[in-house]
Each structure stands twice: as C-alpha cells, then as structure tokens.
C-alpha cells in the first residue's frame, strides 16, 4: 500500500477466531480500497522467508473457510435481522475490552486504559451485557490492543510473517498475543464446554458475516489472495503499533526486523 487512511485499518472485532483472522486482516485492504492504491511491487519489505510453508497453510485455511464458515455466514446473514447482528457483534467486541485494557496499561497509556475499563463497565451494564454500544455514544472510543502490539511498542521487531493453521496471519512477535488473547476472553473461562463452543462458533460466524459484502472487492484488488492478505496484515500491524503515526520508512523498518 502506498497511502493510508488517517483513521487506520479495519480491526478484527471477533479477534483471533481461527481462520477468521486471515479474512479480517484481508479486509483491511478492502477498507483501504476507497482511499489507497494497492501495489504488489511496493517499497515495503514484506518479511516472508517461510512463504513455501505459509502458502499451503493459507490455502488450507481458505478452503476451510469457503467450505464451512462462508456458507454458515451467508445463512446467518439471510435469516438474522440486522439489529440482532449488530447486538451480537457488540457483545463479543465488549468481551475483548479486557484484553484492550490490560495492554493499554502495559503500554503506558493511562487514558486509553481508563477508556477501555469505562467501555467495559458501561456496555456491560447500561448496554445490557455489551449488546448495545452505549460507550461509543458517550465518546468512549474503542481502541483495540493486544500483547503483540505491546511487545512492538517496547521495541521488538515483527520478525518473519507466518500463517498458522486456523489462526491465520501472524508474525513471530504476534504469536504470543494471539494465544494470550484467547485466554483473556471471558468465553475461555466458561466451565460448560458445550455452551462455550456454541458461543465461540456464533462469534466466528457473526464475524465472518461482516465480510460478505466486501469479499468480492478483494478479487478486484489482486488475483493473489495470499499476497493481498499478507500485505494488509503487515501494514495494519505496523499502523496499530505506532497508533497511526508512521511513514513508509517506519513501516519498512518494523516489518523488516
């Protein structure tokens, strides 16, 4: 990408939900399609020494999505009223505020920490368990953070790009955060395994349904879905770690490390 929108890149609201992570990061490129130019020959050094392994893993993840998650998402989208879908998305996004708050604190961002705690408290109570995003209407902005961003803020480079089975796009630096975020999500604390699995499944399908309208645009940006999603992921992570304050040299430096 040669240019970025000032308000950043799309973030996965159903964070780390298996193959959905790949898809949401890919949609970062879709979000940029109205305000940026995609180039597969950009100046960015896309640190991908493990591509011979990454591509087959990506292909399996994508095939799994096309065979299972996409059809489920289409059915969900067709039979579920939009207000209910919004409520489901808000509910799961609210659960991620715990992860956001902890990492805002570790990054030395007291105001962002207070905002995340405030959002969690307000939406969990006035927002009926997070179904209604009351906090945003009160000016408390959602600021997604994770351990990978925290490690990056502390100065660690991204390391090589890696595609994990079902977990999708990652870097060596982001893998610990991907795993930790799962355990910081209250869904992981549920003792009833059947109910927990149902909730995780609903989260994944709801997250996937949010991409249906954008998916066709991806094929118009590039015929190489792997490269498209990789580029989107690497730039999105660099953008998030810098809180949007970076230029092309900063981006190249972070990705190349």
How should these model regions be labeled?
Residues 94-169:
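Mid-length scaffold segments of soluble, non-membrane domains
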Residues 33-34:
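C-terminal motif of bacterial Sec signal peptides marking the signal peptidase cleavage site
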Residues 37, 41-42, 154-257:
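A structured, mid-to-C-terminal "fold-capping" secondary-structure block
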């Amino acid at each position: 990408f040669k240019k970025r929108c000032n308000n950043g890149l799309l973030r996965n609201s159903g964070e780390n939900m298996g193959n959905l992570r790949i898809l949401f990061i890919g949609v970062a490129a879709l979000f940029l399609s109205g305000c940026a130019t995609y180039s597969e020959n950009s100046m960015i050094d896309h640190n991908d020494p493990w591509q011979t392994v990454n591509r087959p893993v990506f292909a399996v993840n994508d095939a799994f999505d096309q065979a299972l998650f996409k059809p489920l998402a289409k059915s969900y989208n067709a039979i579920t009223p939009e207000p209910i879908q919004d409520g489901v998305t808000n509910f799961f996004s609210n659960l991620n505020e715990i992860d956001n708050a902890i990492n805002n604190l570790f990054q030395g961002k007291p105001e962002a920490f207070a905002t995340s705690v405030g959002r969690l408290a307000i939406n969990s109570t006035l927002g009926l368990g997070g179904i209604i995003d009351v906090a945003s209407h009160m000016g408390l902005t959602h600021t997604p953070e994770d351990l990978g961003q925290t490690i990056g803020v502390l100065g660690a480079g991204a390391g090589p790009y890696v595609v994990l089975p079902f977990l999708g796009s990652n870097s060596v630096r982001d893998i610990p955060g991907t795993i930790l975020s799962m355990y910081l999500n209250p869904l992981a604390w549920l003792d009833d395994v059947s109910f927990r699995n149902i909730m995780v499944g609903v989260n994944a399908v709801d997250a996937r349904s949010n991409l249906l309208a954008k998916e066709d645009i991806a094929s118009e940006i590039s015929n190489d879905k792997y490269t498209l999603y990789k580029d989107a992921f690497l730039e999105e992570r660099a953008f998030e770690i810098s809180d949007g304050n970076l230029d092309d040299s900063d981006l190249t430096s972070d990705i190349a490390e």
